[in-house]
Design a protein with these regions (language model features):
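Extracytosolic ligand-binding ectodomains
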Residues: 2-14, 21-114
Length: 114
């Protein structure tokens, strides 16, 4: 329920400000979610929800880059660094609290925790 509320909030913000999202370059949003392992269904559901939200506001300037955290803090940091190398400054996730422990190393990224 908590994840659903946060996703709905993000969607609501995107829908209310579509003019601010229209830009000459792509807006890149990273996703740190479990796409393998025991929690892969949660991750796949979040990816699908975010993509539906982007389609709902009909903005082709937004690109979503999902990365698999495998539900592991070390893998989460690795995935976040990969997104950072792609010059992605906004990341939604990670899903699990335990995966937050190393992310303070990445000061130039804005995380929206689920």
């Amino acid at each position: 329920m908590k994840i659903s509320f946060k996703i709905v909030t993000i969607i609501f913000i995107l829908i209310l400000n579509p003019q601010k999202l229209i830009a000459s370059e792509k807006i890149k949003i990273g996703l740190l979610v479990p796409l393998s392992g025991n929690s892969k269904e949660i991750g796949k559901s979040i990816v699908q929800s975010i993509r539906l939200a982007v389609n709902k506001i009909d903005n082709s300037n937004i690109e979503v880059f999902p990365k698999d955290t495998k539900g592991d803090p070390t893998e989460t940091l690795k995935a976040a660094k990969e997104l950072s190398l792609k010059n992605i400054k906004i990341i939604i996730g990670p899903v699990f609290n335990k995966n937050l422990i190393y992310l303070n190393e990445l000061e130039d990224i804005f995380f929206i925790s689920l």
